[in-house]
């Protein structure tokens, strides 16, 4: 059988055209699929962010409208001796005289929410204000009536003399040991050597 190059060339044109169409269609479909996946992912992320923001705003509004009050009495500022030179801790103030006031509520899960403001003497014996929102998951240990343990966080803003009282955002962990209306509540401020690494605590009275 004789093989005709002209015939082979003629037949190859529609085959190549057909293959090109299939490849183009496949590439186009893949591109559209990737685009739709990206759109759905972006939309899901945005919806989740919007949901978190809406929940936060709702919690702040409900706490602001709550009729319950709290009084705060700062009791200790302890500088972690494992992360400070002794010559520094010897000069630092660890009696944070001050006071604070807040509004609070317990939600349907018995979790604590608060909006608060506090002012106290910092490590250099200078006035330091702080305001913020606090949240704690609460746990009642066994049958110990009136006792509660809490772990959570605060989203706060503070200002210090050594930073010219420029507002500084300060998200921090929170914990508390509570009995009825009285609580011992505190936080730990992380840091580096000779900076931060401070345990700060206060008494809290609710009415």
UniProtKB/Swiss-Prot annotation:
Primary location recorded for the protein, binned into one broad class: membrane
Domain of life of the native organism: Bacteria
Cysteine pairings via disulfide bonds: none
Annotated site location: Role in lipopolysaccharide recognition: 88
UniProt keyword Transit peptide, yes or no: no
Gene Ontology biological process terms in this record: lipid A biosynthetic process
GO cellular component: cell outer membrane
Reaction catalysed by this enzyme: a lipid A + a 1,2-diacyl-sn-glycero-3-phosphocholine = a hepta-acyl lipid A + a 2-acyl-sn-glycero-3-phosphocholine; a lipid IVA + a 1,2-diacyl-sn-glycero-3-phosphocholine = a lipid IVB + a 2-acyl-sn-glycero-3-phosphocholine; a lipid IIA + a 1,2-diacyl-sn-glycero-3-phosphocholine = a lipid IIB + a 2-acyl-sn-glycero-3-phosphocholine
KW Membrane (keyword) present: yes
Catalytic machinery residues: 79, 122-123
UniProt keyword list: Acyltransferase, Cell outer membrane, Membrane, Signal, Transferase
UniProt xrefs under Pfam families: PagP
Cleaved signal peptide residues: 1-24
Assembly and interaction partners: Homodimer.
Protein's name in the database: Lipid A acyltransferase PagP
Organism: Photorhabdus asymbiotica subsp. asymbiotica (strain ATCC 43949 / 3105-77) (Xenorhabdus luminescens (strain 2))
């Amino acid at each position: 059988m004789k093989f005709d190059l002209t015939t082979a060339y003629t037949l190859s044109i529609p085959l190549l055209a057909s293959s090109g169409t299939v490849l183009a269609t496949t590439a186009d479909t893949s591109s559209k699929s990737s685009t739709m996946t990206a759109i759905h992912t972006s939309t899901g992320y945005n919806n989740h962010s919007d949901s978190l923001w809406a929940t936060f705003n709702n919690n702040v509004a409900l706490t602001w409208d709550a009729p319950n009050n709290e009084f705060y009495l700062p009791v200790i500022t302890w500088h972690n001796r494992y992360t400070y030179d002794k010559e520094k801790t010897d000069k630092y103030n660890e009696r944070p005289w001050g006071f604070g006031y807040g509004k609070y509520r317990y939600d349907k899960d018995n979790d604590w929410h608060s909006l608060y403001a506090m002012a106290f003497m910092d490590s250099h014996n200078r006035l330091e204000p702080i305001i913020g929102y606090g949240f704690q998951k609460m746990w009642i240990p066994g049958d110990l009536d009136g006792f509660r343990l809490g772990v959570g966080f605060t989203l706060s803003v503070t200002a210090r003399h050594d930073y010219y009282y420029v507002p500084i955002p300060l998200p921090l962990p929170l914990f508390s040991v509570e009995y009825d209306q009285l609580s011992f509540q505190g936080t730990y401020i992380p840091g580096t050597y000779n900076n931060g690494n401070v345990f700060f605590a206060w008494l809290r009275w609710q009415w």
